[in-house]
Amino acid sequence: MRASQSPMLDPRARQLLRTLIARYIRDGEPVGSKTLAQHAGLDVSPATIRNILADLEDVGLLSSPHTSAGRVPTAHGYRVFVDSLVQMQPPGEEEVRRLRAELASGNGTQSLLGSASQMLSAMSHFVGVVSAPRREQFAFRHIDFVALDARRVLAILVFADNEVQNRVIEPRRAYEPAELERVANYLNAQFAGRALADIRACLLRELRMAKSEMEQLLAHSVELASEALVPADADDMVMAGQTRLMGVQDLSDLDRLRELFEAFASKREILQLLERTIQAPGVRIFIGEETGMVSLEDVSLVTAPYAANGQVLGVLGVIGPKRMAYDRLIPLVQTAADVLGAAMQSPGAR
């Protein structure tokens, strides 16, 4: 539920809801009217506070556990809190310094993604997750072809971020080593520094306009490049800190925890969720059932896209219990996205 769908609350109700949720996030215990009377900073009687809490419960922002006289926020209550009540606590200078040091430019892309997920986990005490950029967004630096036998060719592809991929391709006909060398030299001379997604289309355009003496080389280049430069299936997401959730009180239901870890293992559902946020600017938050996935109904995700050279590359974030310190984690995730994007923008990463 977004802020526009939230019930209208008067200033006293907003202050009580803010105080109650902040106390519950901090202590993990239902919050009663006596505690609120002491900490909400309102000059009202306990009876008035109880009436306001009852109203907040009636509109679905709070619930009352059977074993306690206090109240706890619902997913709807958390949504109102993060949309309009939370008071952000940006990361301190030391945290920002740690992020920049760990995500220093010059590291390869996979190393940066791993470091980012580990730092998010360490700084949030929950799960850090980073979706990987698609390889077709990256420029290639160099390509070589090696004949393995009469029908198979090894393509050795070096990307601008220093990642190397070896791909075995099976052209329609056998190629002599000299032919493979000519094609590699042509591709390196004409297309080094170009994104994979652009190269095949350029080759096809050039083939249509080519003079007869170039047609054979271009035709060979199109055939080999069509297979060698197709983005390979990759590890599309890097996660760290999954086991941290095993000690979280709010996630103590073993059956639900098993479903959550199955989602971590398959990655598909979490990747789908991250894909929904990749074109949305700034931080997006999914709370419980807002994820649309049963396995994630007990957790929240705080996500933000990261970009380099004006292009969104992927999404990073934190997965944790709904009772998380949103005031700290929302700005932390945004800062991590900014730092990772800056590192990816450096020549060593892209």
UniProtKB/Swiss-Prot annotation:
Keywords: Repressor, Stress response, Transcription, Transcription regulation. It comes from the Bacteria. It holds the Pfam family HrcA. One of its GO terms (molecular function) is DNA binding. Gene3D superfamilies: 3.30.450.40, Heat-inducible transcription repressor hrca homolog, domain 3, Winged helix-like DNA-binding domain superfamily/Winged helix DNA-binding domain. Coiled coil: none annotated. Disulfide bonds: none annotated. SUPFAM superfamilies: GAF domain-like, Winged helix' DNA-binding domain. The keyword Transcription regulation applies. InterPro entries: GAF-like_dom_sf, HrcA, HrcA_C, WH-like_DNA-bd_sf, WH_DNA-bd_sf, WHTH_HrcA_DNA-bd, WHTH_transcript_rep_HrcA_IDD. One of its GO terms (biological process) is negative regulation of DNA-templated transcription. Belongs to the HrcA family. Negative regulator of class I heat shock genes (grpE-dnaK-dnaJ and groELS operons). Prevents heat-shock induction of these operons. This is Heat-inducible transcription repressor HrcA.
